[in-house]
């Protein structure tokens, strides 16, 4: 595959529905070209023009050959491709083996945490009873009933090994591949059991669970997993859906293992797999079944009936060991104790409860808290009851409570008033403050704890005081109880006791109950290592989790079922462990439950003992028909072509998946709505599909149960979708949830790839001049203003044209010994009527200039003259309104017209020859200004040795003469040998006065001694000649201005000539490499495009951001970024430039001796340069150069202003150069016309939003017309959309504000530092817009207090960051750069600043002045002195790495590459970055974005290189770059910018 640098393959998987045609075309151009074309290595070969010499003094000079980097780049690309491919092929299970053991537990993934615990290592040592059950399981479907800790999993491992061996034999015999499925009931068990199997089976073991996005996988993905793996560990619902969708068939499974098999009942996925798929397959196609449980029942009731029913459910037979004594040797039962506590008081209202009930008792969202606190007063005591309020009303819980208030009010049948919502929200906040300010007493005071908790405290104190080796688990029924007990025992500070909490994962929790699978694992790891030795846990710790041996298990809340008793008792695995049960004294219910459970255990034991010897039940078979009869009346539908099956249960999941697929360009996931109503004493459910669905839903059939009505309606809806072909044969949606196709794509184009393009040599205006009737002439008065006195007078001249020329800016030329001289040009306001005679005279005067000064004789053709030159009177700028006729020195014109030359005669006064311009009629190299008469020399004297060397040096007459041999002899025989010798200054052949002299030009001798007779004395005044010697440079620059303006006219842009030319000027082959040594630098071209390109790039980003934001209010930030990337990418700009032939106008060559002459005249005498024009008319340009010029044009348009708004012309330029329907804007004010106010913005704002806007206005000075915009700017994505202010999160506004902030910062730097290059500007802009600074600014502005978020970790991060940044500020002694030393802030803080900017911009109707006002007031004070941030960018890891490799080690053969790793659809993107040095991958890193992956890879590379001496570096990486270093070496590495 070709190099995929930050590129994702979208050729087959991306849905382009709804894309505009230009974006689709761009997608094809970028992603679907020939493979070779997509490889930068193949595309980077330099294209050079063999005739592109720019040194006009040496027409045969050849360019120095450029180094060919394609081979090196090709190797680097291949190495990175191999690395990318390797990482792609390594699936999640192989990645499991690469645990970064050096990291702390807090940094490890769940998989690595499990692996680090080394679960199951060395466990394969089966006991006799295990072998006995294994042998049974080999021959028949079996449910193994063994105590917790007795090694049921080992039996499964033995069975898996046996099955795999048979499978390998079957495959060798050509049979169909089959795999084994190990089904578990929780995500944590999926990790744990997969780890155990991997340590004991030498085949590929995969583990899957729903959060991995498995519901979005298609059949091809599952086929790949089935092909790759021998065993798949997964949660049961995954396999159930796969079987129903026919991704996996029952005949593809050789073994089904059910962990904790007692769950197989009712509608559990275990039962549905058996009922809907297993029993529907032919018996010969069914796999072996093996179930594992500590007790076959988990409910009350008839034990035997429940056990036999389980056997029927799983088509298996219960078996247990006959060697009970052997089992007891392995599993030692703990000592059971009963801890009785005094009777509890009835629930009562504590002081805090009374206070809360009096003030806030009618707030419905607090009902659950009231209920728990009421019961806790009895169960746990006053202190614990009160602390429940502290948890329930913590700061991080408030946003969710406020959201729940909205839900409750809006669920009422009456229309909710905003005031009611606001009132309850205010009261919730008041309640939180009340709890915060409440004084909590010491829990050790009498009466604060219940008798139950006091007994627990007493027993724990005794156990932990007696020994430091105690490890304890305390089981509670409620999660709140576990949480508060953990807090209590932390406060009590019992010696040696280190409490922790382990509760289940449950989405949608409030009150600080949120916990993740990762946090569960961390708690278990800490318990294993002893960091925690007293774990307060709910039922999550009872079942299956491999909790390390502990010697004390306490049932704080009494168990309710036999399985709870067996499972929790099984946690006490130490040989001297204690299992304590807490019961209330004189509580008949507790005593009855103890007795009931003991009897149930005895019944269960007897049940197992009466099993026949062969462990097969006889006479107790449960009727299979009665088992399946439950499903009668519940319809099913099977797609014959695929075998996919639709059931009542699967219909709900299928509709959810279908709704998710409709997420096209929205932030929130579309959901199916079920509305259940009662009609005719039955339940009826209406299914409402998301609005993007072509089918909007239906109303189902009546049913007697609400759940059945819902499933029935979902089933019918699926049938309707299938009928309309909206679901395929596997019940997958025909739509695909669209992740933007261009995510992480590299839409840039290589600046190394060049092609030959046409280049305009002359502006078209000169050709038009020849066809324009000669009636009125327009003049431009041109004069020279030197920075210091020149050696010779330079008289103004007038340039006359048939068409009026624009006003040209002043520019510099270099006269004499590099005296900088401004060329001033003033267009005359009035046209000039010239008679035929006068025009003839002007034509003669102009042609005389070309003949005498430049050795070109043109035919006298008035109609072909593009322009005329005339001597002019001196005027200032105010004199441009003077009558043009009065500006021309007609006397001089007439004199030149009447005198072809000043004739030399023998009686001519020698002094009359001084201060004349004399030229050699036969050799254009010799032009002279006479200085004085050399009285001491005669024509026959040899020339002084200081004169420039010529062929004939025997005497001055011969020295002066240019004739050939025969003509020379005739002349010498007749000339006057007594004429005066003149001291003269030889005019240098230098034409490029736009630049200073070269060293060679400076060294040229100009003092000469000549005779006048061999030469011709020009009738042109020397002052005019002096000025006209600069005319080639002047007219070349004017031509460039005119060509640039011609391009602007083509684009319908009005741009100042100096900015226009700057935008089109490329003065070297690598102009874009701002600080690299310039290759083939073109002298005298003035400013190049790089600064304007930097400015234009920033405006382009802002303009397209505004356009996309305005036209697509429902897009999310992700789509905004992608669509903007499509608009502003170099590829798009390049394509537009090619279409509009912008390349023709680019000035890539400096002054040329060949093309400045007037075009169209007939040359009679002199060297014909027309043969050179063909080669001069082509230039080699890189694709990136052409794209950069487009951005520079936008920058030039910005500086040129506009008719109404200063952004008008730049806005128009963006439309012209982006050339997309997404940006059809001709002026700034049109943006607001594109914007349709979204509903949330115009909704009536609530009191809370008004209050927010008022406070922010007081602090920041901006008054919001739409306060809900501000509410959106502070709403974090973690806050559910129905909570808080019920506005979109800040991501859209942040996208807009980011570009606005960039623009205002760049404009400020561009204006303040006119001489700084783009690299410097970029590095210092980085400081101004960095997350580091914006995070500190966010705290300064108080945004951290206003964020609406729902995330415990985020709140903690913000708190810690605020503490650190405020400390840094306090210790900075007033320094404005205090923020530089702080750690990186949580990203939400800088995001809120940018979102605020977006909000005020939208609220002000797109008034950029509000952004500038914010910048001047809040940001600029930090950056008045930019020198203090000179090293900021250099601290960026990527920049630092680049500098270290280049400057310290002198290495150029390295690169930093990034590419996206393929993921399943719907999963977060993962980008791999790697640093490659001389073919060695020295570091790699992964992240969700290319930027952060490169940063991390750079940091790792710096760590590798730390302390390495240059000599050691060269030896280690075989670096010889210093020996072969070339000035044009180019390194491919990301920068800090």
Curated annotation (Swiss-Prot):
InterPro entries: Dicer_dimer_sf, Dicer_dimerisation_dom, DSRM_2, Helicase/UvrB_N, Helicase_ATP-bd, Helicase_C-like, P-loop_NTPase, PAZ_dom. Residues 1439-1507 form the DRBM domain. Residues 133-314 form the Helicase ATP-binding domain. Mg(2+) binds at residues 1294, 1391, 1394. It holds the Pfam family Dicer_dimer. Its EC number is 3.1.26.-, 3.6.4.-. GO terms for cellular component: cytoplasm; nucleus. One of its GO terms (molecular function) is metal ion binding. Residues 891-1019 form the PAZ domain. The keyword Metal-binding applies. One of its GO terms (biological process) is regulation of defense response to virus. A motif (DEAH box) lies at residues 259-262. Residues 1043-1202, 1253-1405 form the RNase III domain. SUPFAM superfamilies: P-loop containing nucleoside triphosphate hydrolases (SSF52540), RNase III domain-like (SSF69065). Transmembrane segments: none annotated. The record marks 1387 as: Important for activity. Residues 459-618 form the Helicase C-terminal domain. Keywords: Antiviral defense, Antiviral protein, ATP-binding, Helicase, Hydrolase, Magnesium, Manganese, Metal-binding, Nucleotide-binding, Repeat, RNA-binding, Zinc. Dicer-like endonuclease involved in cleaving double-stranded RNA in the RNA interference (RNAi) pathway. Produces 21 to 25 bp dsRNAs (siRNAs) which target the selective destruction of homologous RNAs leading to sequence-specific suppression of gene expression, called post-transcriptional gene silencing (PTGS). Part of a broad host defense response against viral infection and transposons. Belongs to the helicase family. Dicer subfamily. This is Dicer-like protein 1.
């Amino acid at each position: 595959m070709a190099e995929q640098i930050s590129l994702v393959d979208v050729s087959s998987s991306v849905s382009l529905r709804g894309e505009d045609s230009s974006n689709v075309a761009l997608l094809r151009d970028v992603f679907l070209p020939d493979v070779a074309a997509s490889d930068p290595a193949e595309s980077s070969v330099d294209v050079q023009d063999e005739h592109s010499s720019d040194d006009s003094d040496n027409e045969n000079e050849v360019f120095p050959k450029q180094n060919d980097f394609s081979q090196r780049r090709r190797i680097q690309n291949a190495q990175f491709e191999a690395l990318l491919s390797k990482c792609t092929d390594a699936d999640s299970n192989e990645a499991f083996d690469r645990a970064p053991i050096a990291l702390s537990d807090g940094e490890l993934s769940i998989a690595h945490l499990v692996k680090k615990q080394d679960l199951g290592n060395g466990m394969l040592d089966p006991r006799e009873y295990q072998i006995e059950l294994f042998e049974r399981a080999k021959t028949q479907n079996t449910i193994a009933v063994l105590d917790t800790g007795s090694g049921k999993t080992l039996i499964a491992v033995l069975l898996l090994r046996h099955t795999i061996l048979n499978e390998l034999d079957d495959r060798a015999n050509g049979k169909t591949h089959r795999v084994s499925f190990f089904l578990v009931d929780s995500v944590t068990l999926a990790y744990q059991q997969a780890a155990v199997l991997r340590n004991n089976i030498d085949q590929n073991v995969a583990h899957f669970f729903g959060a991995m996005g498995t519901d979005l996988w298609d059949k091809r993905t599952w086929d790949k997993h089935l092909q790759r793996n021998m065993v798949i560990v997964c949660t049961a619902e995954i396999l159930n859906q796969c079987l129903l969708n026919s991704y996996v068939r029952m005949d593809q499974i050789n073994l089904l293992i059910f962990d904790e098999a007692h769950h197989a009942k009712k509608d559990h996925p275990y039962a549905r797999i058996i009922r809907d798929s297993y029993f529907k397959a032919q018996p010969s196609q069914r796999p072996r079944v093996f179930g594992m449980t500590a007790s076959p029942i988990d409910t009350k009731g008839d034990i035997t009936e429940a056990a036999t029913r389980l056997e029927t459910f799983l088509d298996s037979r219960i078996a247990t060991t006959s060697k009970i004594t052997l089992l007891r040797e392995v599993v030692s039962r703990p000592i059971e104790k009963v801890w009785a506590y005094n009777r509890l008081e009835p629930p009562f209202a504590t002081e805090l409860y009374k206070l809360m009930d009096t003030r806030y008792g009618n707030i419905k969202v607090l009902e659950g808290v009231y209920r728990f606190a009421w019961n806790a007063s009895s169960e746990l005591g006053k202190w614990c009851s009160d602390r429940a309020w502290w948890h329930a009303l913590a700061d991080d819980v408030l946003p969710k409570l406020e959201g729940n208030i909205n839900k409750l009010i809006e669920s009422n049948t009456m229309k909710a008033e905003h005031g009611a919502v606001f009132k309850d929200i205010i009261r919730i906040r008041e309640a939180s403050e009340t709890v915060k300010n409440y004084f909590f007493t010491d829990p050790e005071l009498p009466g604060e704890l219940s008798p139950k908790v006091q007994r627990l405290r007493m027993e724990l104190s005794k156990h932990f005081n007696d020994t430091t080796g105690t490890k304890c688990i305390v089981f509670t029924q409620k999660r709140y109880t576990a949480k508060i007990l953990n807090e209590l025992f932390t406060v009590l500070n019992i010696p040696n006791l280190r409490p922790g909490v382990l509760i289940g994962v449950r989405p949608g929790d409030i009150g600080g109950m949120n916990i993740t699978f990762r946090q569960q694992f961390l708690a278990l790891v800490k318990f294993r290592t002893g960091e925690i030795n007293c774990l307060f846990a709910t039922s999550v710790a009872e079942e299956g989790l491999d909790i390390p041996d502990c010697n004390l298990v306490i049932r704080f809340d009494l168990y309710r079922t036999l399985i709870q008793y067996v499972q929790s008792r099984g946690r006490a695995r130490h040989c001297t462990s204690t299992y304590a049960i807490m019961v209330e004294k004189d509580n008949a219910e507790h005593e009855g439950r103890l007795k009931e459970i003991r009897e149930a255990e005895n019944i269960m034991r007897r049940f197992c003992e009466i099993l026949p010897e062969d462990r097969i039940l006889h006479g107790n078979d449960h009727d299979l028909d009665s088992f399946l009869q439950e499903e009668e009346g519940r319809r099913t539908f099977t797609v014959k072509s695929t075998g996919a099956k639709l059931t009542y249960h699967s219909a709900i999941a299928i509709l959810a998946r279908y709704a998710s697929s409709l997420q096209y360009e929205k932030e929130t996931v579309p959901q199916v709505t079920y509305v259940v109503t009662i009609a005719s004493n039955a339940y009826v459910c209406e299914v409402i599909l998301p609005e993007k669905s072509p089918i909007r839903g239906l109303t189902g059939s009546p049913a007697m149960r609400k759940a059945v009505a819902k499933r029935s309606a979902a089933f019918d809806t699926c049938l309707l979708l299938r009928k309309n072909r909206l679901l395929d044969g596997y019940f997958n949606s025909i739509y695909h949830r669209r992740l933007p196709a261009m995510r992480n794509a590299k839409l840039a184009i290589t600046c190394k790839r060049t092609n030959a393009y046409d280049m305009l040599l002359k502006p078209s205006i000169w050709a038009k001049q020849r066809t324009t009737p000669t009636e009125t002439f327009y003049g431009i008065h041109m004069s020279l203003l030197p920075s210091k006195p020149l050696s010779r007078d330079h008289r103004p001249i007038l340039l006359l044209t048939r068409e009026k020329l624009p006003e040209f800016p002043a520019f510099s030329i270099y006269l004499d010994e590099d005296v900088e001289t401004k060329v001033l040009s003033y267009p005359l306001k009035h046209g000039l009527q010239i008679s035929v005679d006068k025009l003839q005279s002007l034509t003669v005067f102009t042609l005389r200039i070309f003949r005498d000064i430049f050795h070109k004789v043109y035919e006298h053709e008035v109609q072909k003259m593009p322009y005329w030159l005339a001597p002019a009177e001196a005027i200032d700028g105010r004199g441009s309104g003077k009558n043009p006729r009065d500006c021309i020195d007609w006397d001089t014109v007439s004199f030149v017209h009447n005198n072809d030359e000043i004739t030399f005669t023998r009686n001519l006064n020698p002094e009359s020859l001084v201060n004349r311009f004399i030229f050699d009629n036969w050799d254009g190299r010799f032009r002279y200004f006479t200085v004085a008469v050399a009285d001491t020399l005669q024509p026959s004297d040899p020339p002084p040795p200081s004169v420039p060397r010529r062929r004939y040096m025997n005497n001055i007459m011969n020295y002066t003469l240019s004739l050939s041999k025969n003509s020379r002899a005739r002349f010498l025989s007749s000339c006057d040998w007594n004429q005066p010798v003149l001291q003269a200054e030889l005019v240098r052949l230098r034409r490029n006065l736009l630049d200073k002299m070269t060293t060679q030009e400076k060294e040229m001798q100009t003092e000469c001694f000549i005779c006048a007779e061999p030469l011709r004395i020009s009738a042109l005044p020397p002052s005019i000649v002096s000025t006209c010697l600069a005319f080639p440079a002047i007219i070349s620059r004017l031509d460039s201005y005119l060509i640039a303006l011609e391009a602007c006219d083509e684009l319908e842009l009005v741009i100042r000539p100096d900015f226009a030319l700057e935008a089109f000027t490329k003065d070297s082959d690598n102009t874009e490499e701002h600080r690299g040594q310039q290759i083939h630098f073109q002298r005298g071209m003035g400013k190049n495009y790089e600064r304007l390109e930097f400015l234009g790039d920033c405006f382009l980003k802002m303009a397209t951001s505004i356009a996309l934001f305005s036209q697509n209010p429902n897009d999310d930030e992700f789509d905004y970024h992608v669509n903007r990337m499509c608009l502003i990418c170099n590829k798009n700009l390049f394509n537009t430039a090619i279409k509009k032939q912008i390349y023709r106008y680019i000035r890539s060559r400096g002054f040329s001796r060949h093309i400045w002459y007037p075009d169209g005249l007939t040359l009679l005498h002199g060297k014909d340069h027309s043969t050179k024009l063909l080669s001069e008319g082509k230039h080699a340009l890189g694709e990136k150069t052409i794209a950069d010029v487009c951005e520079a044009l936008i920058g030039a348009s910005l500086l040129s202003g506009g008719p109404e708004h200063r952004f008008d012309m730049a806005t128009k330029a963006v439309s012209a150069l982006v050339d997309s329907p997404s940006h059809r804007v001709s002026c700034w004010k049109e943006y607001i016309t594109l914007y349709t106010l979204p509903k949330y913005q115009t909704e009536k704002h609530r009191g809370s939003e008004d209050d927010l806007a008022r406070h922010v206005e007081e602090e920041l000075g901006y008054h919001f017309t739409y306060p809900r915009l501000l509410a959106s700017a502070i709403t974090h994505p973690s806050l559910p959309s129905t909570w808080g202010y019920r506005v979109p999160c800040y991501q859209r506004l942040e996208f807009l504000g980011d570009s606005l902030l960039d623009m205002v910062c760049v404009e400020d730097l561009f204006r303040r530092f006119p001489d700084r290059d783009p690299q410097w500007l970029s590095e210092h802009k980085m400081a101004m817009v960095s997350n580091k600074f914006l995070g500190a600014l966010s705290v300064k502005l108080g945004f951290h207090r206003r964020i609406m978020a729902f995330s415990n970790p985020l709140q903690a991060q913000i708190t810690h960051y605020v503490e650190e940044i405020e400390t840094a500020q306090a210790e900075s002694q007033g320094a404005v750069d205090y923020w530089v030393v702080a750690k990186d802030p949580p990203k939400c803080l800088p995001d809120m600043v940018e979102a605020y900017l977006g909000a005020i911009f939208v609220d002000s109707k797109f008034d950029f002045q509000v952004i500038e006002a914010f910048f001047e007031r809040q940001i600029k004070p930090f950056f008045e002195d930019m020198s203090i941030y000179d090293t900021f960018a250099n601290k960026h890891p990527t920049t630092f790495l680049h500098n270290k490799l280049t400057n310290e080690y002198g290495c150029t053969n390295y690169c930093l590459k990034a590419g996206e790793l393929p993921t399943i659809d719907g999963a977060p993107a993962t980008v791999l970055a790697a640093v490659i040095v001389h073919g060695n991958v020295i570091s790699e890193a992964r992240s969700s974005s290319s930027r952060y992956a490169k940063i991390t890879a750079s940091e790792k590379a710096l760590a590798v290189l730390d302390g390495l001496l240059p000599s050691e570096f060269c030896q280690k990486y075989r670096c010889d770059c210093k020996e072969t270093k070339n000035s044009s070496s180019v390194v491919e590495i990301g920068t800090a910018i």
